[in-house]
Amino acid sequence: MKNYDIYKMKHAGLTNGQVLNVLRYAENKEKELSLRDIAVVSECRNPALFMERYKQIDDDFLKKSFEEFPSFSILDEIYPWDLSEIYNPPALLFYQGNIDLLELPKVAVVGSRDSSKLGNQSVQKIIKELNNELIIVSGLARGIDTAAHMAALQNGGRTIAVIGTGLDVFYPKANKKLQSYIGKNHLVLSEYGPGEQPLKFHFPERNRIIAGLCRGVIVAEAKMRSGSLITCERAMEEGRDVFAIPGSILDGKSDGCHHLIQEGA
């Protein structure tokens, strides 16, 4: 099954998990799957609706969108082994930049969008101390993510940004130059096709990729019940090392980090 076929199935309404169901089934079958086969084995809620949407797709138009950026799928050799081992690994990823960075050792950095000066400085110091031995992976959000990417660049290191939009969408807009620079000189990844906007549920989905690419996750200024805390707890369940940076006990910004430290991070 080709990468475009995966993109088309998702465009017709299948979730990532449902696409994975199809790929696993197809792997064990020598014959090409019919549309009805795909609808059934995907376990989608409304097979008839999926098939109708699939048939209505304008292939010429969709292929133009698909070909705007290079991509790789879970079926390709370049797909990172660590990422393939997580729960619900992305079936398809679009990218800009140096794909070879995926083969190098990486550490993720996550944390608050509303970070403090102390939080940013803590991340900058740790990344400097790593001495460019690891690729810094983060989500290009405001706050800790931006501090992590910038620290990697300022110290002559390399960085990977995993974003929650299409590669042609800049969110936040303040990071447009940074995203463009990383895409040209380092690597930007997304499981969302061109034009896809920053929907709320995209960001926890993005976070699983950030953690999944790496054997370790550094977290700074995570509040309780924050997305960063959930990402770290999931990373721990996946067997990743989590390194929580302690912060002030006065403002609640690092309560999630302190919880992780109590749990053994």
Give, region by region, the residue ranges found by the protein language model.
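Short, positively charged patches
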Residues: 1-128
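Glycine-biased, small-residue-rich flexible motifs in mid-sequence functional cores and linkers
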Residues: 3, 74-265
